């Protein structure tokens, strides 16, 4: 876990991944600031192997908050390249999380009427979205493709598509937010994942893009609406076929049992894919970390937010794990 390894032709100094944060330290146009670079550099300096940025909007219409990081325009490239160089100077690798807010934004923030799979309003600070049409779908796919190109151009080691956090792709995947009756509707898992898979496939088909693709998602809220273990198997199969390289499932606690089985979500996914996994969910003690070590196919371990609050926690954890492994 704390030793160097190689994956996808990339050399990582260890398997620890610093969690993405929603610091919103970019300027009002989404451009990287000096404060943002200092924030991420301080985390990388602790010794983690990989940094993952907060969600970066792939299009202005997909911006979810003021100060959110952007990767939608050429003007974002210079700052992003400075961020990448600063992190790599500290010895860590870095990925960027690509997102589109969908209905979870407002006209004040994104500059237009929010767009989502169906009409929806997330509450007082948001606006009622309009339903995306075929033209919107084509544009959204291109936004993600161009963002992937920019990420590779400035030197990011991988991208992560955000399929969680109740953002656009999660909205499509959830029957709570998606009540369409067309090919992108909620009737089947394939339909609910159609936009996601089209985005990933389009990135894969782009000859100028060879960057590894991680996919971030959560299913526990869907389980309340009838999502089953069979649905999970179908989800993994569809995502693999589209071109996902890494699965990053999120759970409130990484070892919580899933589908009334004896296994956690991470374990179930590991049994049904050959792709490497990211272990994420309340890993904030040596005991939990050692427990997760026994799960097959885990490539990265996301340290909990304690890493942000206690500057020396990484070295403390490293020593504790080493002591308990003796």
Question: Could you tell me what each predicted segment is?
Answer:
Residues 1-326:
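Flavin-dependent oxidoreductase catalytic cores
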